[in-house]
Amino acid sequence: MYTSLEICAGAGGQALGLERAGFNHTLLVEYEPSYCACLKANRPGWDVRCMDVHNLSGIPYYNRIDLLSGGVPCPPFSHAGKQLGADDERDLFPEMIRLAAEINPKVVMIENVRGFLDQKFSEYRERIINEIETLGYNTHIQLLNASDYGVPQLRPRVVIIGVRNDLTDTFSFFNLNSNSHYGKKGCGDTVDEAVFRNEAETPRRSAAVSCRRLL
């Protein structure tokens, strides 16, 4: 199996997808305790660290990781926020690049909101791409929509892929799924069975247990 290290792991959506794709998670890092609890409840065997990624050293993982991934915080670039970009203390693109330099993974994958493609962030975006390429990666960036890949929701996301130069100089994103579905049509009875409809129907239970029903 391929090895991966993921930061900003959240409740584990991306981690579970990578698991299905054949990746063995060496380490998952998440800051929010409730999300960490969800991860641990669903996959007790995973090494989940509930910590600030600024305090994570990638040096112990040098040349041990195939994929370094992370859905770094969206608020700095989201249309729903103030779009402070690099001036937002929650911007973790620099930390992802630092870890890539320390770990030297074969592939780097970064996910963020489509606001990252806004013109106002063009200089910052170019800087990020250049820094990844300076580390020795062929870098590709594209806006993808989860519904085009069989996920029952509209979720456009920017995905940046960096492939180490010594491995290949070509890369292409997967073809789109022409039979995409989203909303009620896509979720059907699965979501009806899994999701509580309102707070009154939700018993008092830990975030981990509630999340476990969804995953």
Regions found by a protein language model. Give the residues of each.
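Conserved SAM-binding strand-loop segment of SAM-dependent methyltransferases
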Residues: G45-D52
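Conserved SAM/SAH-binding beta-strand->alpha-helix loop
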Residues: E32-P33
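Class I SAM-dependent methyltransferase "Motif I" SAM/SAH-binding loop
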Residues: I7-A11
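Conserved SAM-binding loop
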Residues: L39
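Conserved beta-strand elements of the Class I
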Residues: T3-L5
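Class I S-adenosyl-L-methionine
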Residues: L56-L67, P75-L215
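A short, Lys/Arg-enriched amphipathic alpha-helix followed by its capping loop at the start of a domain
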Residues: G17-H25, N42
